[in-house]
Amino acid sequence: MKWIAKKRLQSVLGLSVVDGQLRVAHVARAKSAIAVVRSASAKLSLDLLHPEAELVGREIKNHLEAAGIRERNCVIALPPSWIMTQHAKLPELSAEDQASLLQIEAEKGFPVDPDELQIARSPHRSSESAYVTQLAVRRDQLTRLSTVLKAAGLKPE
């Protein structure tokens, strides 16, 4: 059986929205380096979580067109206000028990049910103990963001 290899992108659009300010940078491979092809910044009149995702997507698309940016493959930095964090000390436990402990910590530490969150974990050690940092974002926000990006004609990677 022959596997189809995913082609490496030669360029990508990076986006961030913080406090209603859209910032974009189109970057591309240039020999042995990465170069910024074009960048732009614009104030959004609509919030990313506006009920009509198509309108938000259209506004982003209009800003990209005005800046002369045609790249559609993108990555996006999540708005910092969407990210919840939690830091926990991990006792010596089996992997299964650690997963259960982190689930309990998430239930106690985050303001919503962990089933409504996308949680990423980053383990780290000090000389004395093991710790984990849990980062969480509401799934409904991620779904809305995906809908907005698709409405803007973008392809999140």
For each predicted feature, which ranges?
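Hydrophobic/aromatic-enriched cytosolic interaction surfaces used to assemble or bind macromolecules
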Residues: M1-E157
